[in-house]
């Protein structure tokens, strides 16, 4: 089981490091295809959110291949980011993916968005041909585990997300949100979720600016808000008390000089910026201005901590589910590992049987139909008796971690390695590329 994971997340790296690794949604298909075609990597997927960027893959040379890919994709030396990177392999890689999909590794434990984000990453990987059988099995099982965690525990009983935490932080700043106005820059799922929370907490007016105006109009209609063309952003954003931004832009769209103009037009009435984008939309220097308060994705952790104690018991229950599911998944993979050996053994012994029947015909001449049937039944019976013990042993061994040793032993006894070499000579080497 050669699964490997490498990445950075909110636990290991601050936002200024995570934004260095962030991959825009528009580039994700290209990056995923590059991952799967990198030498040594057999199949792979990339998850890129505001809180994590990680690659999961099956690899010949382990995380050496993954680090090589990081160097190629980002034009960096991974050693420079050693203190921020985490790596998992084999069982721990499986456990990590189950925990991520189940929201046990999220900034807000139990938040529902991460499962959708992992599913989108998986869909992208499938679309570009980067997923083959084993990674497909891993992700399919991860989604099932996530569903079981949400069904069998109360980990998601109180709806918590980055968006809801952002709104809670706004309430801490302003007290009540009644009569306040909010300007949302971006029209993604997180922005829409935040808008719902703002409306539920009494916000009076919502403005929406998006790169695609039509999408902004559709977004604003859902909340009886007002869509603003993106080219009018800087002259209209100071209408609002609260600005929530999540655009996916490669550089900050709000800088200190913008803030100075906003405060001047507002006659120094304060503005609150909630920046949930990675890379960040708001330059940190904006915080130097009196009257402007900027909170980025890492600042939200201060609010998140208030939710942690409520969920500890449920998280422990969820962790137990994940651990049990990891064992089941590994046993299933080991079972799949023995199937090719069983098939090779059956084919090998059938070849021997047919060769011996042909040799018998050469010695005895033409056989009658009745004799043919008798010889066929006799030889099949002998072969089945010969195969019974090794096949039973293989199936039993598949349930144990040491199954590889038994598989190798059976291959040696029946000379199946040489048979595989002969097949390779006849058919040629396997083709390289994604999903190979």
Swiss-Prot record:
Binding-site residues for substrate, renumbered to this chain:
49-52, 106, 111-113, 117
Q: Does the keyword field hold NADP?
A: yes
Q: Where is this site: Important for activity?
A: 96
Q: Key word Oxidoreductase present in the record?
A: yes
GO MF annotations in UniProt? glutamyl-tRNA reductase activity; NADP binding
Q: Where does NADP(+) bind?
A: 186-191
Q: What is its EC number?
A: 1.2.1.70
Please provide the record's keywords in A-Z order: NADP, Oxidoreductase, Porphyrin biosynthesis
GO BP, sorted A to Z:
protoporphyrinogen IX biosynthetic process from glutamate
Catalytic residues of the enzyme:
50
Q: In which pathway does it act?
A: Porphyrin-containing compound metabolism; protoporphyrin-IX biosynthesis; 5-aminolevulinate from L-glutamyl-tRNA(Glu): step 1/2
User: What catalytic activity does the UniProt entry give for this protein?
Assistant: (S)-4-amino-5-oxopentanoate + tRNA(Glu) + NADP(+) = L-glutamyl-tRNA(Glu) + NADPH + H(+)
Tell me the HAMAP family matching this sequence: Glu_tRNA_reductase
Cite the domain annotation text: Possesses an unusual extended V-shaped dimeric structure with each monomer consisting of three distinct domains arranged along a curved 'spinal' alpha-helix. The N-terminal catalytic domain specifically recognizes the glutamate moiety of the substrate. The second domain is the NADPH-binding domain, and the third C-terminal domain is responsible for dimerization.
PANTHER family found in the cross-reference section: GLUTAMYL-TRNA REDUCTASE
Quaternary structure, per UniProt, is: Homodimer.
The text of the family note is:
Belongs to the glutamyl-tRNA reductase family.
Question: Any remaining note in the record?
Answer: During catalysis, the active site Cys acts as a nucleophile attacking the alpha-carbonyl group of tRNA-bound glutamate with the formation of a thioester intermediate between enzyme and glutamate, and the concomitant release of tRNA(Glu). The thioester intermediate is finally reduced by direct hydride transfer from NADPH, to form the product GSA.
What this chain does, per the entry, is described as: Catalyzes the NADPH-dependent reduction of glutamyl-tRNA(Glu) to glutamate 1-semialdehyde (GSA).
Protein name from the UniProt record: Glutamyl-tRNA reductase 2
Q: Which organism is it from?
A: Koribacter versatilis (strain Ellin345)
Q: What is the lineage of its organism?
A: Bacteria, Pseudomonadati, Acidobacteriota, Terriglobia, Terriglobales
Q: Which gene encodes it?
A: hemA2
